[in-house]
Each structure stands twice: as structure tokens, then as C-alpha cells.
Amino acid sequence: MFGTSVSALCLLFLLSVCTACYISNCPIGGKRSALAFPSRKCMSCGPGDRGRCFGPNICCGEGMGCYVGSPEAAGCVEENYLPSPCEVGGRVCGSEEGRCAAPGICCDVEGCSIDQSCTEEDEAEYISQSVSSSHGHDLLMKLLNMISHTPPHRVHK
């Protein structure tokens, strides 16, 4: 009889530990409070705060393109420490929950890629002015490839 009650008590203890929030992933107010937070815009970033954070080291905006792993995007790390989720806006693009970040560029939390679905008629004019001919497209592809292979800049204290 005593063994059964101890087993039941241990089972209840393990169950409570398994369903508990941990310090790193528990929102303020408990697990169910995450749905109570209203969505908000992601933090501003980049030159003149004209961009929005798309990930911990990605800052993109209309007319400025995207900064990945650069000092302009360094402030985006703070987004990880805020208790409520944010939305960057823009159309859904890419295969992994990406959003249109700038004309012709789709970004998610991990990185950015060229995506033609992010190009509208008025945005196509912006691209043709800033990047001319297929040579410009090749240059943009090389830059995106370089950015994805270079480690982010680190600030050492």
C-alpha cells in the first residue's frame, strides 16, 4: 500500500516537472499567457531606424535593402529578450515562413534570399533603377551568397 502511494506521488511530481515552464522559454504570466499578448511590430533598426528586425542579426527595409550580421543589425538581438512576439509585416514568401523584406528579397529568421514574389510593379521600377541588367542580378546573388557564408560581427566586451 505504501509503495503504491509513493509511486503515485512520484508520478505526480514528474508530471508537474514535465509541464512546467522553464526560465528560458516561459513567458511572463505562465505558458497560457503567451496568447494574451497583442502582436506588435518588430523593433526598428538600421540607418535612421528605417528598417525592421527580421531575425537576431537581420535588418531590412524599403529603400535600404538588408543588413545581415552587420553593426546595423546588431540591435536586433534584443528582440529575443522581449516577452511578446512581434510581426514584421509584408507578404509571406519563400518556403520557411519568410516575409518580403525589401523589393525582390525574402527573409526569415535564418537569412535572406532573392524571391520574385516580393517584386511588385512599383518595386520592379526601384530594382531596375538600382540594379541594371543581368550583371546587377549576378552581383546581388554573389553578395547574398557572401553574406550567408560570413560569420556575424561580434561585439566583445
Curated annotation (Swiss-Prot):
Major subcellular location class: secreted
Cellular compartments annotated: Secreted
SMART domains, A to Z: NH
Glycine amide PTM positions: 29
Signal sequence segment: 1-20
Modification note: Seven disulfide bonds are present in neurophysin.
One matching Pfam family: Hormone_5
General function of this protein: Isotocin causes contraction of smooth muscles.
PANTHER family: ISOTOCIN, NEUROPHYSIN
Protein's name in the database: Isotocin-neurophysin IT 1
Organism: Oncorhynchus masou
Source taxonomy: Eukaryota, Metazoa, Chordata, Craniata, Vertebrata
